């Protein structure tokens, strides 16, 4: 039974891209005859809850993938709950998370709180059908991938072709998870498209809008 929450004065590096440093809360959990201290993310992991609360980069993706694989090894049937509040980021890092979500047999329920933009919106849509949720004031943004290139003309052409291939693949993934036609997905993603929770529901990115119930879903 959870008893107390402490705040540590130590700091941890949460993302390699922003080098953000914040104090990580610790909790004290009563277990049988004794107590055990966890950082808050480890404690949530015990309840099969993982958090994507930063830009998507290789460092964050590695940590999140490791958590998904660990929870899959613990139970291949119990749901995993992924909470998303992310502006997006690296396409390749996001696709690594996406492929892991699709590979494991444990269903992944996705929840957007705050925002799910760019790759964040794709990972939101990639949750188990019927288990993709938005909180009432969440914002979702979809768009096509972007990037730059420099060097010789040949190098620039190669890079442009790769971005075009990634754009096509991302469009196909959105089609698969939303049920919307490829042409409509391509038109929608041509520019930044911001959506409310209700608009994301209509678009097929989420299955429901959660009301504030005061309880946190677990397995």
Curated annotation (Swiss-Prot):
Chief subcellular location: mitochondrion
This enzyme's EC code(s): 3.4.21.92
Subcellular location per the Swiss-Prot or TrEMBL entry: Mitochondrion matrix
Gene Ontology cellular-component annotations: endopeptidase Clp complex; mitochondrial matrix
Transit peptide among keywords: yes
Gene3D superfamilies tied to this protein: 2-enoyl-CoA Hydratase, Chain A, domain 1
Keywords of this entry: Hydrolase, Mitochondrion, Protease, Serine protease, Transit peptide
Highest rank taxon of the organism: Eukaryota
InterPro entries (alphabetical): ClpP, ClpP/crotonase-like_dom_sf, ClpP/TepA, ClpP_His_AS, ClpP_Ser_AS
Boundaries of the annotated transit peptide in chain numbering: 1-23
GO biological processes: mitochondrial unfolded protein response; protein quality control for misfolded or incompletely synthesized proteins
Reaction(s) catalysed by this chain's protein: Hydrolysis of proteins to small peptides in the presence of ATP and magnesium. alpha-casein is the usual test substrate. In the absence of ATP, only oligopeptides shorter than five residues are hydrolyzed (such as succinyl-Leu-Tyr-|-NHMec, and Leu-Tyr-Leu-|-Tyr-Trp, in which cleavage of the -Tyr-|-Leu- and -Tyr-|-Trp bonds also occurs)
GO molecular function: ATP-dependent peptidase activity; ATPase binding; serine-type endopeptidase activity
Entry-linked Pfam families: CLP_protease
Active-site annotation: 118 (nucleophile), 143
Entry keyword ATP-binding: no
Family, similarity comment: Belongs to the peptidase S14 family.
HAMAP family noted in UniProt: ClpP
Oligomeric form and interacting partners: Tetradecamer that assembles into a two heptameric rings with a central cavity.
Function recorded in the entry: Clp cleaves peptides in various proteins in a process that requires ATP hydrolysis. Clp may be responsible for a fairly general and central housekeeping function rather than for the degradation of specific substrates.
Name assigned to this protein: ATP-dependent Clp protease proteolytic subunit 1, mitochondrial
């Amino acid at each position: 039974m959870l008893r107390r929450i402490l705040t540590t004065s130590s700091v941890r590096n949460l993302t390699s891209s922003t080098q953000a440093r914040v104090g990580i809360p610790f909790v004290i959990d009563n277990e049988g005859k004794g107590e055990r201290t966890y950082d808050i993310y480890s404690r949530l992991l015990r309840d099969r809850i993982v958090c994507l609360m930063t830009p998507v980069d290789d460092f964050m993706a590695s940590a999140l993938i490791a958590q998904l694989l660990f929870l899959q090894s613990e139970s291949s049937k119990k749901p995993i709950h992924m909470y998303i509040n992310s502006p997006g980021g690296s396409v390749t890092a996001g696709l690594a998370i996406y492929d892991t979500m699709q590979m494991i047999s444990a269903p992944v329920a996705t929840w957007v709180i705050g925002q799910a933009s760019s790759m964040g919106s794709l990972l939101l849509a990639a949750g188990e059908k019927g288990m993709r949720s938005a909180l009432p004031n969440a914002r979702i943004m979809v768009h096509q991938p972007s990037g730059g290139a420099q060097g010789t003309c040949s190098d620039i052409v190669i890079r442009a072709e790769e971005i075009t291939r990634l754009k096509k693949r991302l469009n196909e993934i959105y089609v698969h998870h939303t049920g919307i036609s490829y042409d409509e997905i391509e038109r929608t993603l041509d520019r930044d498209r911001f959506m409310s929770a209700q608009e994301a529901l209509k678009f097929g990115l989420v299955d429901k809008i959660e009301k504030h119930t005061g309880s946190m879903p677990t397995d």
